[in-house]
């Protein structure tokens, strides 16, 4: 069925665990109720998802590192009747729950990078459809082994990395060991692999010397890879892949062979995309799926290679009526040797209004970085201020919240 780090779980292990859940008191009347899962062991999460889905229950996934009190509050807000925290035997019953007449669903909170996290609900029937069309679009051989470095408490690691693999008869390897050398050894010892990771993990893996080793397939998602990291990985990878999606829709598109770090590929069969083809005038990516229209708030355009990402609508900076896309400015700074990381965001000026601000991890003087930008960008795109920092804060999936950076600027 699957492997967690180096521990293998068979079909009989799966069945024994499901039978154990049958006997637990909290699951005797599971149908129609919501359960929150904040668990450390991927095998616990996956087996409970299978079990509760079969019981026609809804499941709220919460990242394993969430403190218990916070996780309980999240479960209460989601109207769950209880939460399993840490281990599958640690169940906390929650009171004052209103009965919900809903189709059994998978529940998740959005990342909150652009504001307060929202509770997203997707029916299990929608998840089943996603798995079916995802496997069709992925067109992966059964003997290609998914190595899942993304958490299974998130739909990317759970649905795309794990459930889709089990459905097509593959045996995924889920990595929770925090040592990047451990993960790299697993990859190197698995000839036909497809690595599921986010840019932060790939950045760490890419920092180790590869020698003559060649990655088979790397799948990235969650945020665009920095341009320099993309080209570095592409040199040692047979197929650089990227999938694009959102909490409301799941996976929307897959790119099988990236030519640029912003390539999102073609839509899955169950999704249709409304978007323009002018690179200089990107539009919001609007997805039609299951008789509903999803406004992603992502900007992009389409070409013969498929979809291309340009940025978040919320992140676009309006400098005296001219639009600045943070990704373009970040890429320019990252092309300067010695700039390790860069994040560009909106600042406020009492007279000028919106301005471009940046934080960088670099030993180079910010004045020199600004001079570099002036040589390669129109003046209105050049950061008004560049701050040198030792760390750029990221959330658990490796995303940076420009909104929080902006709010920090406003309140100081």
Swiss-Prot record:
Domain of life per record: Bacteria
Regulation (activators, inhibitors): ATP-pyrophosphate exchange is inhibited in vitro by nonhydrolyzable acylsulfamate analogs that mimic the AsbC-bound intermediate 3,4-dihydroxybenzoyl-AMP.
Enzyme class, broadest EC rank: ligase
Effect of inactivating the gene: The deletion mutant cannot produce petrobactin on iron-depleted medium. In vitro analysis show that mutants grow to a very limited extent as vegetative cells in iron-depleted medium but are not able to outgrow from spores under the same culture conditions.
InterPro entries xrefs: AMP-bd_C, AMP-bd_C_sf, AMP-binding_CS, AMP-dep_synth/lig_dom, ANL_N_sf
PROSITE patterns: AMP_BINDING (PS00455)
One annotated GO biological process: fatty acid metabolic process
Pfam families registered for this protein in UniProt: AMP-binding, AMP-binding_C
Record carries keyword Cell inner membrane: no
Task of the protein: Involved in the biosynthesis of petrobactin, a catecholate siderophore that functions in both iron acquisition and virulence. Catalyzes the adenylation of 3,4-dihydroxybenzoate (3,4-DHBA) to the corresponding AMP ester, followed by the transfer of the activated unit to the phosphopantetheine thiol of the aryl-carrier protein AsbD.
Family recorded in the similarity comment: Belongs to the ATP-dependent AMP-binding enzyme family.
The protein's name in its UniProt record: 3,4-dihydroxybenzoate--[aryl-carrier protein] ligase
Organism of origin: Bacillus anthracis
Gene from which the chain derives: asbC
């Amino acid at each position: 069925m699957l492997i967690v780090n180096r521990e293998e779980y068979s079909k009989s292990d799966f069945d024994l665990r499901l039978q154990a859940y049958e006997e637990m008191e909290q699951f005797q009347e599971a149908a129609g109720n919501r359960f929150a899962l904040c668990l450390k062991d991927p095998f616990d999460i996956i087996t409970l998802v299978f079990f509760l889905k079969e019981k026609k229950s809804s499941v709220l996934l919460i990242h394993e590192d969430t403190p218990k009190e916070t996780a309980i509050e999240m479960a209460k807000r989601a109207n769950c009747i209880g939460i399993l925290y840490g281990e599958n035997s640690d169940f906390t019953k929650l009171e004052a729950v209103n009965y919900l007449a809903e189709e059994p669903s998978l529940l998740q909170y959005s990342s909150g990078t652009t504001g307060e996290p929202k509770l997203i609900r997707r029916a299990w029937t929608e998840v089943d459809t996603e798995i079916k069309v995802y496997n069709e679009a992925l067109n992966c051989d059964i003997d290609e082994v998914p190595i899942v470095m993304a958490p299974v408490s998130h739909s990317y690691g759970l649905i795309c990395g794990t459930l889709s693999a089990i459905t097509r008869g593959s045996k995924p390897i889920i990595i929770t060991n925090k040592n990047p050398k451990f993960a790299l050894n697993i990859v190197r010892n698995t000839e036909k692999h497809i690595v599921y990771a986010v840019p932060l993990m790939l950045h760490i893996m890419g920092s180790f010397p590869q020698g003559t080793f060649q990655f088979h397939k790397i799948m990235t998602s969650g945020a665009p890879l920095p341009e320099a990291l993309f080209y570095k990985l592409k040199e040692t990878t047979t197929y650089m892949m990227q999938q694009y999606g959102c909490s409301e829709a799941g996976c929307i598109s897959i790119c099988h062979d990236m030519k640029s770090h912003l390539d999102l590929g073609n839509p899955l069969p169950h999704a249709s995309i409304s978007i323009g083809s002018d690179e200089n005038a990107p539009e919001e990516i609007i997805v039609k799926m299951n008789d509903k229209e999803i406004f992603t708030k992502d900007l992009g355009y389409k070409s013969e290679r498929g979809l291309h990402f340009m940025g978040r609508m919320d992140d676009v900076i309006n400098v005296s009526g001219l639009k600045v896309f943070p990704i373009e400015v970040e890429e320019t700074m990252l092309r300067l040797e010695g700039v390790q990381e860069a994040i560009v965001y909106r600042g406020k000026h009492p007279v000028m209004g919106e301005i471009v601000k940046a934080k960088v991890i670099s030993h180079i003087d910010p004045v020199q970085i600004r001079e570099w930008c002036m040589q390669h960008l129109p003046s209105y795109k050049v950061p008004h201020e560049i701050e040198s920092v030792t760390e750029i804060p990221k959330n658990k999936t490796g995303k940076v919240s420009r909104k929080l950076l902006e709010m920090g600027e406003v309140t100081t």
